From Swiss-Prot:
Belongs to the cytochrome P450 family. Its main location: membrane. It comes from Candida maltosa (Yeast). PROSITE patterns: CYTOCHROME_P450. This is Cytochrome P450 52A9.
Amino acid sequence: MIDEILPKLVQYWYIVLPTLLIIKHVVSYINTQRLMRKFRAKPVTNVLNDGFFGIPNGIKAIKEKNKGRAQEYNDEKFAAGPKPKVGTYLFKLFTKDVLVTKDPENIKAILATQFEDFSLGKRLDFFKPLLGYGIFTLDGEGWKHSRAMLRPQFAREQVGHVKLIEPHFQSLKKHIIKNKGQFFDIQELFFRFTVDSATEFLFGESVESLKDESIGYDQQDFDFDGRKNFAEAFNKAQEYLGTRAILQLFYWLVNGADFKKSVAEVHKFTDYYVQKALDATPEELEKHSGYIFLYELVQQTRDPKVLRDQSLNILLAGRDTTAGLLSFALFELARNPEVWSRLREEIGDKFGLDEDATIEGISFESLKQCEYLKAVVNECLRMYPSVPRNFRIATKHTTLPRGGGPDGKDPIFIKKGAVVSYGINSTHLDPMYYGPDARLFNPDRWSKPETKKLGWAFLPFNGGPRICLGQQFALTEASYVLVRMIQNFKELELTPNTVYPPRRLTNLTMSLYDGAYIKVN
Protein backbone atom coordinates (compact mmCIF):
# COMPACT_ATOMS: atom_id res chain seq x y z
CA MET A 1 0.00 0.00 0.00
CA ILE A 2 2.70 2.48 1.09
CA ASP A 3 4.88 1.33 -1.82
CA GLU A 4 2.11 2.38 -4.20
CA ILE A 5 1.34 5.76 -2.56
CA LEU A 6 4.90 6.99 -1.86
CA PRO A 7 5.99 7.42 -5.51
CA LYS A 8 2.88 9.49 -6.21
CA LEU A 9 3.49 11.68 -3.15
CA VAL A 10 7.04 12.30 -4.33
CA GLN A 11 5.86 12.93 -7.89
CA TYR A 12 3.35 15.53 -6.74
CA TRP A 13 5.43 17.04 -3.91
CA TYR A 14 4.57 20.57 -5.06
CA ILE A 15 0.93 19.84 -4.20
CA VAL A 16 1.50 17.64 -1.14
CA LEU A 17 3.89 19.97 0.70
CA PRO A 18 1.69 23.10 0.59
CA THR A 19 -1.33 20.96 1.54
CA LEU A 20 0.46 19.60 4.61
CA LEU A 21 1.55 23.10 5.62
CA ILE A 22 -2.01 24.37 5.29
CA ILE A 23 -3.35 21.47 7.37
CA LYS A 24 -0.68 22.11 10.02
CA HIS A 25 -1.59 25.81 10.11
CA VAL A 26 -5.35 25.09 10.39
CA VAL A 27 -4.86 22.54 13.19
CA SER A 28 -2.56 24.96 15.05
CA TYR A 29 -5.09 27.78 14.63
CA ILE A 30 -7.98 25.65 15.95
CA ASN A 31 -5.90 24.49 18.90
CA THR A 32 -4.84 28.06 19.72
CA GLN A 33 -8.46 29.26 19.61
CA ARG A 34 -9.47 26.47 21.98
CA LEU A 35 -6.69 27.37 24.42
CA MET A 36 -7.57 31.07 24.24
CA ARG A 37 -11.13 30.26 25.29
CA LYS A 38 -9.81 28.05 28.09
CA PHE A 39 -7.56 30.84 29.41
CA ARG A 40 -10.21 33.53 28.78
CA ALA A 41 -7.80 35.48 26.62
CA LYS A 42 -8.35 37.69 23.57
CA PRO A 43 -6.37 37.95 20.31
CA VAL A 44 -3.37 40.28 20.37
CA THR A 45 -4.53 43.78 19.40
CA ASN A 46 -1.47 44.73 17.34
CA VAL A 47 -0.37 42.04 14.89
CA LEU A 48 2.20 43.42 12.45
CA ASN A 49 2.93 42.46 8.86
CA ASP A 50 5.62 39.78 8.82
CA GLY A 51 6.86 39.79 5.25
CA PHE A 52 8.14 36.38 4.16
CA PHE A 53 8.22 34.29 7.39
CA GLY A 54 9.58 37.30 9.25
CA ILE A 55 12.87 37.16 7.36
CA PRO A 56 12.64 40.81 6.18
CA ASN A 57 11.98 41.82 9.81
CA GLY A 58 15.09 39.98 10.95
CA ILE A 59 17.31 41.44 8.25
CA LYS A 60 16.00 44.94 9.00
CA ALA A 61 16.59 44.44 12.75
CA ILE A 62 20.24 43.50 12.16
CA LYS A 63 20.76 46.43 9.76
CA GLU A 64 19.21 48.92 12.19
CA LYS A 65 21.31 47.52 15.06
CA ASN A 66 24.45 47.95 12.97
CA LYS A 67 23.47 51.58 12.25
CA GLY A 68 22.91 52.38 15.93
CA ARG A 69 19.13 52.50 15.55
CA ALA A 70 17.96 49.33 17.31
CA GLN A 71 15.85 51.23 19.86
CA GLU A 72 14.33 53.56 17.26
CA TYR A 73 13.42 50.52 15.16
CA ASN A 74 11.63 49.01 18.15
CA ASP A 75 9.73 52.27 18.78
CA GLU A 76 8.71 52.37 15.12
CA LYS A 77 7.30 48.85 15.49
CA PHE A 78 5.20 49.92 18.48
CA ALA A 79 3.82 52.81 16.41
CA ALA A 80 3.08 50.62 13.37
CA GLY A 81 0.16 48.68 14.85
CA PRO A 82 -3.52 49.62 14.42
CA LYS A 83 -3.59 50.76 18.09
CA PRO A 84 -0.22 52.50 18.67
CA LYS A 85 -1.06 53.37 22.28
CA VAL A 86 -1.32 49.68 23.15
CA GLY A 87 2.14 48.77 24.46
CA THR A 88 2.31 45.27 22.96
CA TYR A 89 2.67 43.86 19.44
CA LEU A 90 3.17 40.49 17.77
CA PHE A 91 5.40 39.88 14.74
CA LYS A 92 7.58 37.22 13.17
CA LEU A 93 11.37 37.30 13.41
CA PHE A 94 13.23 34.75 11.28
CA THR A 95 10.19 32.39 11.19
CA LYS A 96 9.59 32.70 14.97
CA ASP A 97 6.56 34.46 16.49
CA VAL A 98 7.79 37.13 18.91
CA LEU A 99 5.57 39.10 21.27
CA VAL A 100 7.10 42.46 22.21
CA THR A 101 5.78 44.50 25.13
CA LYS A 102 6.57 47.72 26.98
CA ASP A 103 3.51 47.50 29.22
CA PRO A 104 4.65 47.60 32.89
CA GLU A 105 1.90 45.17 33.92
CA ASN A 106 3.13 42.61 31.41
CA ILE A 107 6.76 43.17 32.41
CA LYS A 108 5.81 42.70 36.07
CA ALA A 109 4.11 39.40 35.18
CA ILE A 110 7.12 38.15 33.18
CA LEU A 111 9.71 39.06 35.80
CA ALA A 112 7.86 38.61 39.08
CA THR A 113 4.25 37.52 39.54
CA GLN A 114 4.49 34.80 36.84
CA PHE A 115 8.24 34.26 37.10
CA GLU A 116 7.96 30.46 36.92
CA ASP A 117 6.02 30.69 33.63
CA PHE A 118 9.06 32.03 31.76
CA SER A 119 12.69 31.01 31.25
CA LEU A 120 15.74 32.34 29.41
CA GLY A 121 15.10 29.85 26.60
CA LYS A 122 18.04 29.65 24.22
CA ARG A 123 20.02 32.45 25.86
CA LEU A 124 22.58 29.88 27.03
CA ASP A 125 23.01 28.68 23.43
CA PHE A 126 23.33 32.26 22.15
CA PHE A 127 25.87 33.40 24.76
CA LYS A 128 27.61 30.21 25.90
CA PRO A 129 30.70 30.50 23.65
CA LEU A 130 31.76 33.67 25.49
CA LEU A 131 30.02 33.66 28.89
CA GLY A 132 29.70 29.93 29.54
CA TYR A 133 27.52 28.72 32.40
CA GLY A 134 27.22 31.88 34.49
CA ILE A 135 24.58 33.79 36.39
CA PHE A 136 23.39 35.63 33.25
CA THR A 137 23.02 32.52 31.10
CA LEU A 138 21.65 29.90 33.50
CA ASP A 139 18.07 29.02 34.43
CA GLY A 140 16.47 26.96 37.16
CA GLU A 141 18.67 25.28 39.76
CA GLY A 142 21.89 26.34 37.99
CA TRP A 143 20.86 29.98 38.26
CA LYS A 144 19.75 29.61 41.89
CA HIS A 145 23.12 28.06 42.78
CA SER A 146 25.00 30.84 40.95
CA ARG A 147 23.01 33.56 42.68
CA ALA A 148 23.48 31.98 46.11
CA MET A 149 27.22 31.71 45.44
CA LEU A 150 27.58 35.31 44.21
CA ARG A 151 25.17 37.17 46.49
CA PRO A 152 27.61 37.39 49.46
CA GLN A 153 30.20 38.97 47.16
CA PHE A 154 27.91 42.00 46.76
CA ALA A 155 27.33 42.68 50.44
CA ARG A 156 27.11 46.33 51.40
CA GLU A 157 30.63 46.51 52.85
CA GLN A 158 32.04 45.33 49.51
CA VAL A 159 30.03 47.55 47.14
CA GLY A 160 30.32 50.59 49.38
CA HIS A 161 34.11 50.57 49.45
CA VAL A 162 34.99 53.59 47.30
CA LYS A 163 38.68 53.91 48.20
CA LEU A 164 39.65 51.38 45.51
CA ILE A 165 38.19 53.67 42.84
CA GLU A 166 40.30 56.77 43.54
CA PRO A 167 43.66 55.54 42.09
CA HIS A 168 41.91 54.70 38.83
CA PHE A 169 40.21 58.09 38.82
CA GLN A 170 43.63 59.72 39.13
CA SER A 171 44.75 57.91 35.96
CA LEU A 172 41.52 58.98 34.24
CA LYS A 173 42.08 62.56 35.37
CA LYS A 174 45.56 62.61 33.80
CA HIS A 175 44.07 61.62 30.44
CA ILE A 176 41.41 64.33 30.72
CA ILE A 177 43.98 67.00 31.62
CA LYS A 178 46.16 65.77 28.74
CA ASN A 179 43.23 66.54 26.40
CA LYS A 180 42.34 69.85 28.05
CA GLY A 181 41.08 72.41 25.56
CA GLN A 182 40.37 69.89 22.81
CA PHE A 183 37.58 67.46 22.06
CA PHE A 184 38.19 63.82 22.98
CA ASP A 185 36.12 60.66 23.41
CA ILE A 186 35.53 60.22 27.13
CA GLN A 187 33.53 57.03 26.53
CA GLU A 188 36.69 55.24 25.40
CA LEU A 189 38.37 56.35 28.64
CA PHE A 190 35.40 55.27 30.76
CA PHE A 191 35.53 51.76 29.30
CA ARG A 192 39.21 51.58 30.23
CA PHE A 193 38.49 53.03 33.67
CA THR A 194 35.75 50.49 34.46
CA VAL A 195 37.80 47.50 33.30
CA ASP A 196 40.63 48.73 35.54
CA SER A 197 38.38 49.08 38.59
CA ALA A 198 36.40 45.90 37.82
CA THR A 199 39.52 43.75 37.47
CA GLU A 200 40.84 45.06 40.79
CA PHE A 201 37.52 44.24 42.50
CA LEU A 202 37.30 40.83 40.81
CA PHE A 203 40.91 39.70 40.72
CA GLY A 204 42.77 41.83 43.26
CA GLU A 205 44.99 43.15 40.49
CA SER A 206 44.01 45.82 37.98
CA VAL A 207 44.71 45.41 34.29
CA GLU A 208 45.79 49.11 34.38
CA SER A 209 44.67 49.88 30.84
CA LEU A 210 44.63 53.63 31.57
CA LYS A 211 48.30 53.67 32.55
CA ASP A 212 49.72 54.05 29.06
CA GLU A 213 52.66 55.87 27.50
CA SER A 214 50.63 59.04 26.84
CA ILE A 215 50.53 59.80 30.59
CA GLY A 216 54.03 58.57 31.38
CA TYR A 217 53.70 54.84 32.06
CA ASP A 218 55.36 51.85 30.44
CA GLN A 219 52.66 49.35 29.48
CA GLN A 220 55.16 46.50 29.59
CA ASP A 221 55.13 46.82 33.38
CA PHE A 222 51.54 45.53 33.40
CA ASP A 223 51.65 43.15 30.44
CA PHE A 224 50.75 39.47 30.33
CA ASP A 225 49.55 37.10 27.63
CA GLY A 226 45.99 38.02 26.65
CA ARG A 227 45.93 41.50 28.21
CA LYS A 228 46.71 43.58 25.14
CA ASN A 229 43.85 42.39 22.95
CA PHE A 230 41.23 41.89 25.66
CA ALA A 231 39.13 45.06 25.29
CA GLU A 232 38.82 44.85 21.50
CA ALA A 233 38.13 41.10 21.63
CA PHE A 234 35.48 41.53 24.36
CA ASN A 235 33.68 44.22 22.36
CA LYS A 236 33.81 42.22 19.14
CA ALA A 237 32.60 39.01 20.78
CA GLN A 238 29.61 40.88 22.23
CA GLU A 239 28.68 42.22 18.80
CA TYR A 240 28.53 38.65 17.53
CA LEU A 241 26.44 37.56 20.53
CA GLY A 242 23.96 40.37 19.86
CA THR A 243 23.51 39.15 16.28
CA ARG A 244 23.14 35.53 17.44
CA ALA A 245 20.26 36.61 19.71
CA ILE A 246 18.46 38.37 16.84
CA LEU A 247 18.83 35.31 14.59
CA GLN A 248 16.91 33.17 17.13
CA LEU A 249 16.71 29.60 15.71
CA PHE A 250 19.53 30.37 13.28
CA TYR A 251 21.99 31.65 15.91
CA TRP A 252 24.45 28.89 14.96
CA LEU A 253 25.12 30.67 11.65
CA VAL A 254 27.26 33.17 13.59
CA ASN A 255 30.15 30.97 14.63
CA GLY A 256 33.00 31.95 12.34
CA ALA A 257 36.75 32.12 12.85
CA ASP A 258 36.77 35.80 13.85
CA PHE A 259 34.15 35.18 16.55
CA LYS A 260 36.07 32.18 17.90
CA LYS A 261 39.33 34.13 17.90
CA SER A 262 37.74 36.95 19.93
CA VAL A 263 36.30 34.48 22.44
CA ALA A 264 39.69 32.76 22.80
CA GLU A 265 41.38 36.11 23.55
CA VAL A 266 38.82 36.92 26.25
CA HIS A 267 39.18 33.47 27.83
CA LYS A 268 42.97 33.73 27.80
CA PHE A 269 42.72 37.04 29.66
CA THR A 270 40.36 35.65 32.33
CA ASP A 271 42.23 32.36 32.71
CA TYR A 272 45.38 34.28 33.69
CA TYR A 273 43.65 35.61 36.81
CA VAL A 274 41.81 32.36 37.55
CA GLN A 275 45.08 30.43 37.54
CA LYS A 276 46.71 32.97 39.86
CA ALA A 277 43.87 32.51 42.34
CA LEU A 278 44.06 28.71 42.10
CA ASP A 279 47.83 28.77 42.59
CA ALA A 280 47.55 30.82 45.79
CA THR A 281 47.91 28.81 48.99
CA PRO A 282 45.08 28.80 51.57
CA GLU A 283 47.29 30.93 53.81
CA GLU A 284 47.81 33.49 51.03
CA LEU A 285 44.08 33.61 50.32
CA GLU A 286 43.30 34.11 53.99
CA LYS A 287 45.84 36.82 54.76
CA HIS A 288 45.38 38.88 51.56
CA SER A 289 44.53 42.44 52.55
CA GLY A 290 41.29 43.87 51.19
CA TYR A 291 38.38 42.18 49.47
CA ILE A 292 38.98 40.14 46.28
CA PHE A 293 35.96 38.63 44.54
CA LEU A 294 37.79 35.72 42.88
CA TYR A 295 39.69 34.76 46.04
CA GLU A 296 36.39 34.56 47.93
CA LEU A 297 34.91 32.46 45.11
CA VAL A 298 37.89 30.08 45.15
CA GLN A 299 36.96 29.18 48.71
CA GLN A 300 33.59 27.92 47.39
CA THR A 301 34.77 26.14 44.22
CA ARG A 302 38.10 25.26 42.61
CA ASP A 303 36.62 24.42 39.22
CA PRO A 304 38.51 26.71 36.78
CA LYS A 305 35.62 26.66 34.29
CA VAL A 306 33.11 27.79 36.93
CA LEU A 307 35.52 30.49 38.12
CA ARG A 308 36.11 31.75 34.59
CA ASP A 309 32.42 31.74 33.63
CA GLN A 310 31.20 33.53 36.75
CA SER A 311 34.07 36.05 36.61
CA LEU A 312 33.30 36.87 32.98
CA ASN A 313 29.61 37.28 33.71
CA ILE A 314 30.39 39.76 36.48
CA LEU A 315 33.13 41.48 34.45
CA LEU A 316 30.60 42.09 31.66
CA ALA A 317 28.30 43.83 34.13
CA GLY A 318 31.08 45.60 36.02
CA ARG A 319 32.73 47.06 32.95
CA ASP A 320 30.07 47.69 30.33
CA THR A 321 27.05 48.88 32.29
CA THR A 322 28.91 51.45 34.41
CA ALA A 323 30.97 52.71 31.46
CA GLY A 324 27.78 53.16 29.44
CA LEU A 325 26.03 54.99 32.28
CA LEU A 326 28.98 57.36 32.82
CA SER A 327 29.30 58.04 29.08
CA PHE A 328 25.62 58.89 28.65
CA ALA A 329 25.76 61.04 31.80
CA LEU A 330 28.71 63.12 30.55
CA PHE A 331 27.09 63.37 27.11
CA GLU A 332 23.90 64.83 28.62
CA LEU A 333 25.71 67.01 31.16
CA ALA A 334 27.80 68.55 28.38
CA ARG A 335 24.53 69.29 26.52
CA ASN A 336 22.89 70.76 29.63
CA PRO A 337 25.31 73.20 31.33
CA GLU A 338 22.60 74.37 33.76
CA VAL A 339 22.37 70.82 35.15
CA TRP A 340 26.16 70.69 35.51
CA SER A 341 26.08 74.01 37.40
CA ARG A 342 23.42 72.75 39.82
CA LEU A 343 25.45 69.61 40.43
CA ARG A 344 28.51 71.76 41.15
CA GLU A 345 26.48 73.62 43.79
CA GLU A 346 25.27 70.45 45.50
CA ILE A 347 28.63 68.68 45.41
CA GLY A 348 30.45 71.85 46.46
CA ASP A 349 28.28 72.14 49.57
CA LYS A 350 28.86 68.51 50.55
CA PHE A 351 32.41 67.70 49.45
CA GLY A 352 34.03 70.94 48.24
CA LEU A 353 35.24 71.96 44.76
CA ASP A 354 38.55 72.59 43.01
CA GLU A 355 41.29 73.38 45.58
CA ASP A 356 38.85 72.85 48.46
CA ALA A 357 37.72 69.42 47.24
CA THR A 358 38.02 66.52 49.66
CA ILE A 359 37.44 62.80 49.21
CA GLU A 360 37.39 61.73 52.86
CA GLY A 361 33.66 62.34 53.21
CA ILE A 362 32.66 60.56 50.00
CA SER A 363 31.12 57.22 50.93
CA PHE A 364 28.32 54.85 50.04
CA GLU A 365 26.11 56.60 52.63
CA SER A 366 26.99 60.22 51.77
CA LEU A 367 26.52 59.67 48.03
CA LYS A 368 22.96 58.48 48.69
CA GLN A 369 22.25 61.83 50.37
CA CYS A 370 23.04 63.83 47.21
CA GLU A 371 19.47 64.26 45.97
CA TYR A 372 20.16 66.12 42.72
CA LEU A 373 23.00 63.75 41.84
CA LYS A 374 20.60 60.82 42.35
CA ALA A 375 18.07 62.57 40.10
CA VAL A 376 20.66 63.01 37.34
CA VAL A 377 21.74 59.36 37.56
CA ASN A 378 18.11 58.20 37.52
CA GLU A 379 17.38 60.33 34.48
CA CYS A 380 20.37 58.86 32.64
CA LEU A 381 19.23 55.34 33.56
CA ARG A 382 15.72 56.19 32.38
CA MET A 383 16.75 57.51 28.98
CA TYR A 384 19.63 55.09 28.46
CA PRO A 385 19.08 51.84 30.41
CA SER A 386 22.13 49.56 30.27
CA VAL A 387 20.08 46.62 28.98
CA PRO A 388 17.36 48.27 26.88
CA ARG A 389 15.63 45.09 25.79
CA ASN A 390 15.47 41.50 26.98
CA PHE A 391 13.48 38.35 26.28
CA ARG A 392 12.01 35.26 27.87
CA ILE A 393 10.49 31.96 26.66
CA ALA A 394 7.17 30.63 27.99
CA THR A 395 7.73 27.36 29.87
CA LYS A 396 4.01 26.46 29.66
CA HIS A 397 0.73 27.76 28.25
CA THR A 398 0.00 30.98 30.13
CA THR A 399 -1.29 34.54 29.73
CA LEU A 400 -0.12 38.12 30.10
CA PRO A 401 -2.53 40.63 31.68
CA ARG A 402 -2.81 43.15 28.82
CA GLY A 403 -2.44 43.59 25.07
CA GLY A 404 -5.54 41.84 23.71
CA GLY A 405 -9.03 42.67 22.51
CA PRO A 406 -10.25 45.79 20.69
CA ASP A 407 -8.61 48.24 23.12
CA GLY A 408 -5.61 46.19 24.26
CA LYS A 409 -6.84 45.90 27.85
CA ASP A 410 -7.69 42.20 27.80
CA PRO A 411 -5.36 39.30 28.70
CA ILE A 412 -3.48 37.61 25.87
CA PHE A 413 -2.65 33.94 25.48
CA ILE A 414 1.03 32.93 25.48
CA LYS A 415 1.71 29.51 24.02
CA LYS A 416 4.35 27.24 25.54
CA GLY A 417 7.65 27.94 23.78
CA ALA A 418 6.61 31.44 22.65
CA VAL A 419 9.25 34.20 22.64
CA VAL A 420 8.30 37.25 24.71
CA SER A 421 10.51 40.35 24.52
CA TYR A 422 10.20 43.31 26.88
CA GLY A 423 11.54 46.72 25.90
CA ILE A 424 12.56 48.70 28.98
CA ASN A 425 13.90 51.56 26.86
CA SER A 426 10.51 52.00 25.19
CA THR A 427 8.74 51.95 28.57
CA HIS A 428 11.11 54.59 29.93
CA LEU A 429 10.37 56.94 27.02
CA ASP A 430 6.60 56.48 26.99
CA PRO A 431 4.61 59.72 27.61
CA MET A 432 1.94 57.58 29.32
CA TYR A 433 4.29 57.20 32.29
CA TYR A 434 6.63 60.19 32.00
CA GLY A 435 4.47 62.89 30.46
CA PRO A 436 4.80 64.85 27.20
CA ASP A 437 8.49 65.60 27.84
CA ALA A 438 9.38 61.90 28.17
CA ARG A 439 12.10 62.16 25.51
CA LEU A 440 13.73 65.21 27.10
CA PHE A 441 16.54 65.03 29.64
CA ASN A 442 14.97 66.50 32.77
CA PRO A 443 16.35 65.44 36.19
CA ASP A 444 13.73 67.61 37.92
CA ARG A 445 11.05 65.04 37.09
CA TRP A 446 12.47 62.89 39.92
CA SER A 447 11.39 65.43 42.55
CA LYS A 448 7.73 65.16 41.49
CA PRO A 449 5.40 62.98 43.63
CA GLU A 450 4.09 61.01 40.63
CA THR A 451 7.61 59.81 39.80
CA LYS A 452 7.76 58.04 43.15
CA LYS A 453 4.85 55.83 42.04
CA LEU A 454 6.30 54.56 38.75
CA GLY A 455 6.74 50.99 39.98
CA TRP A 456 7.45 48.69 37.03
CA ALA A 457 7.62 51.63 34.60
CA PHE A 458 11.18 52.33 35.84
CA LEU A 459 13.36 49.26 35.63
CA PRO A 460 17.03 50.08 34.93
CA PHE A 461 18.30 47.02 36.83
CA ASN A 462 15.65 44.46 35.87
CA GLY A 463 13.20 43.29 38.53
CA GLY A 464 11.83 40.31 40.40
CA PRO A 465 14.02 37.36 41.49
CA ARG A 466 16.59 38.16 38.76
CA ILE A 467 17.08 41.79 39.79
CA CYS A 468 20.69 42.88 39.31
CA LEU A 469 22.96 41.82 42.20
CA GLY A 470 25.45 44.57 41.36
CA GLN A 471 22.95 47.46 41.36
CA GLN A 472 24.45 49.27 44.35
CA PHE A 473 27.99 48.56 43.13
CA ALA A 474 27.25 50.26 39.78
CA LEU A 475 25.41 53.21 41.34
CA THR A 476 28.15 53.79 43.91
CA GLU A 477 30.96 53.68 41.35
CA ALA A 478 29.15 55.89 38.82
CA SER A 479 28.15 58.42 41.50
CA TYR A 480 31.69 58.55 42.90
CA VAL A 481 33.20 59.22 39.47
CA LEU A 482 30.63 61.92 38.72
CA VAL A 483 31.38 63.63 42.05
CA ARG A 484 35.12 63.58 41.34
CA MET A 485 34.56 64.93 37.82
CA ILE A 486 32.39 67.74 39.22
CA GLN A 487 34.99 68.56 41.88
CA ASN A 488 37.82 68.80 39.36
CA PHE A 489 36.34 70.36 36.22
CA LYS A 490 34.32 73.57 35.94
CA GLU A 491 32.78 73.27 32.48
CA LEU A 492 31.97 70.65 29.86
CA GLU A 493 31.34 71.25 26.19
CA LEU A 494 29.92 68.90 23.57
CA THR A 495 31.20 68.75 20.00
CA PRO A 496 29.25 71.27 17.88
CA ASN A 497 26.52 69.78 15.65
CA THR A 498 26.41 66.55 17.66
CA VAL A 499 23.49 64.40 16.50
CA TYR A 500 20.62 64.21 19.01
CA PRO A 501 19.20 61.89 20.10
CA PRO A 502 22.50 60.03 19.85
CA ARG A 503 22.96 56.79 17.97
CA ARG A 504 23.24 53.89 20.40
CA LEU A 505 25.30 50.74 20.10
CA THR A 506 23.19 47.85 21.39
CA ASN A 507 24.80 44.47 21.94
CA LEU A 508 24.45 42.82 25.34
CA THR A 509 24.50 46.31 26.86
CA MET A 510 24.05 49.81 25.44
CA SER A 511 26.61 52.56 24.82
CA LEU A 512 27.09 55.55 22.52
CA TYR A 513 27.58 54.42 18.92
CA ASP A 514 29.71 57.47 18.03
CA GLY A 515 31.38 57.92 21.40
CA ALA A 516 31.05 60.93 23.73
CA TYR A 517 33.28 63.69 22.39
CA ILE A 518 33.53 66.47 24.95
CA LYS A 519 35.89 69.30 25.85
CA VAL A 520 36.75 70.03 29.48
CA ASN A 521 37.56 73.55 30.68
